Amino acid sequence: MTVPPAVPPSDSPPVPGPRRRWQAGTLTYTAGGLAVLFCWMLWGDFAWQLKERAAPPVVQLMLRKFQASDFLTGLFLLSLPAAVGLFLGPLISYRSDRHRGPWGRRIPFLLITSPIATLAMCGLAFSPWIGTALHARMGWAPASLHLTVIVVLGLSWTVFEFATVAANAVFGGLINDVVPREVIGRFFGMFRAVSLLAGMLFNFYLIGHAKEHFLPILAGIGLLYGGGVVLMCLRVKEGDYPPPEPPAPGQRPGLVGAVRTYARDCFSRPYYLWVFASMALAQLAFSPVNLFCVYAAESFGLSMSTYGRYLVAAYAGSLLLAYPLGWMADRFHAVRMALGTLAVYAAVMAVGYFGIVGPASFGAVFFAHVLLSGCYFTGAAALGQMLFPKMKFAQFASAGNLILALGNIGFGPAMGLLLDQLGHDYRYTFAAGCLLALLGLLAGVVVYRRWLALGGAAGYAAPE
């Protein structure tokens, strides 16, 4: 028998296998490229979320300082943003989906709106001085001083909301365009973690000083927001997009044709109407407590410092859950995550209505509210990206926000008026949250069954 000659060992190292790559449209990422993308996007989100966490509660405290009613607070903080979003969100998103330029289709809109939001936050910060100076200049009666300040505050808030709504209409679209679909749930988990860190920093260090030092808080965060988002836009690159769809035969040019196309795309299929309703009701369910939580804390004897610590504790819990919830959304799908969270939230809100009797019980239910709403906004964050058509994502997302805006326009003042009539009994905010969560859960079950019929997690394709 012939023995084959021994093969001498090779001195060359083994050839490594091909590195894994992720793709989002025409963009391709290695692990390092994906990490760089995440870092810049998360930096922009940190600036964004710090603005979102700071502006509403500080403005709420300013409104209370100048003796605004609950009705006016609901009008400012919920109905006004909804009214702006009702027409501006669809317009910006429709144009963004169809825009093609050297900077992409999302980044130009963010570069324009960020400085406007910064200026508006500075306007909010200086509203008391501007209002006082205007009142003195016009020689109005002393009794109208607070009203003058509130009007100036409202004008600055309106400009702020115009910029925020316009930016929000395209920020989610930017994520949809540059983040690979395979990791979108985990990406939103990290987004949520950054949001929570921003909330923890604000509520631990700043909320207790907001009544006396709202000027440096609002102006400083406004400058950080403008600079942070602009820097993100300069460092993140969009890919190439196919040309927008040509107008349909017989479609009228201009605004009328665009409105008809928008309405036909978004509202002609019952499936998407159920999706919009379920998402709007779910988000609206968190609004009653969110809108009046500062006033509720004071009415139940909770100081602003203790209130801030409850928020920080809830944010810390949500922070620990953020990445696991994002992984679960990738693994089990955002539709299932939304349904489970809403069911638990409805039960907790019922406990809040019947069980809150003082600061300790309010703090416990409020802690659960923040934690569970955070679970929803993390686990269901990618719901739109997973259900809407990819190339028309911003348009469909704005249609969902339009439905939410219609609810907010009426709900904010109605809830405030109800609380004014009920002697500011803020337990009713928990009852309203329970009812809306149950309605959102029912609509979500309809969506879930139709999603399964369209292929479910394995074979779903968004109908167009």
PLM regions with names:
Residues 105-108, 141-143, 208-223, 417-437:
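A membrane-interface helix-boundary motif in multi-pass transporters
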Residues 13-33, 242-275, 463-464:
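Juxtamembrane intracellular "pre-TM" segments in multi-pass secondary transporters
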Residues 335-377:
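C-terminal transmembrane helical hairpin of 12-TM major facilitator-type secondary transporters
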Residues 106-123, 336-351:
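Structural signature of the two symmetry-related core transmembrane helices
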Residues 19-82, 271-278, 282-300:
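Helix-loop boundary and gating motifs at the non-cytosolic
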Residues 87-103, 321-333, 419:
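Helix-to-loop junctions at the C-terminal end of transmembrane segments
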Residues 59, 166-179, 375-389:
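Intracellular juxtamembrane helix-capping segments at the cytosolic ends
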Residues 124-131, 226-236, 431-464:
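Multi-pass alpha-helical transporter architecture, strongest
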